[in-house]
């Protein structure tokens, strides 16, 4: 099961715990894209996610200088007991016949990524680009905090503008369920990505 902590583009909030419970009841891992929220706003593994991914190019890097991504494996999902992931359980002929679940247990998924996908595709970043991302991480919490503060001011302005029909951001959602999920998962703010709809048609927007 693959979801986003904040849906693109309207920043819809998902109930991570509920979806995690449903996935685990069917012996399926929950994978979450946490790019919009970042670890500063929400840490999905604490709510039951098994794997978290980020586009590091966005908030982690912070300056649009580097392309990269992050995969975080919680190490909590039992891939062998699931019975749905033969490529992790059965011997891999391209890697000396190793069974990743037998060799490293719950770390089978991330180990296969390193041993097979990295080997086959070369999906890794250079030392310099890694350095740039690490520099970005040093200021991540402060930057995201400011992003949220600035976004809330713009959202408030647009939400009260007579020519704006609707603003899509969890802080101003009129949906009771979204309001509850926002309070539960985002005590530090609902991110800085939002969309809005203007009143009238395309021509009126141009006018």
Residue spans for each PLM region:
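Conserved PLP-enzyme active-site core in the AAT-like
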Residues: 1-161, 168
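Conserved small-domain helix->loop->beta segment predominantly found in fold-type I
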Residues: 121-124, 130, 139, 151-207
């Amino acid at each position: 099961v693959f979801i986003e902590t904040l849906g693109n583009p309207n920043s819809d909030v998902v109930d991570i715990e509920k979806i995690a419970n449903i996935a685990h009841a069917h012996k399926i891992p929950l994978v979450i894209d946490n790019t919009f929220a970042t670890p500063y706003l929400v840490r999905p593994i604490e709510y039951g996610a098994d794997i978290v991914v980020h586009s590091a190019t966005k908030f982690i890097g912070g300056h649009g200088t580097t392309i990269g991504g992050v995969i975080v494996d919680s190490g909590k999902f039992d891939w062998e007991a699931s019975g749905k992931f033969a490529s992790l359980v059965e011997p891999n002929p391209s890697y000396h016949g190793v069974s990743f679940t037998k060799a490293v247990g719950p770390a089978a998924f991330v180990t296969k990524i390193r041993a097979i996908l990295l080997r086959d595709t070369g999906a890794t970043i250079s030392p310099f680009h890694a350095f740039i991302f690490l520099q970005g991480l040093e200021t991540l919490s402060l930057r995201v905090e400011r992003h949220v503060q600035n976004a809330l001011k713009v959202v408030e302005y647009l939400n009260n503008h007579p020519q704006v029909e609707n603003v899509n951001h969890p802080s101003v959602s009129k949906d009771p369920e979204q309001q509850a999920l926002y309070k539960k998962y985002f005590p530090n703010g609902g991110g800085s990505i939002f969309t809005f709809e203007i009143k009238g048609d395309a021509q009126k927007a141009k006018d």
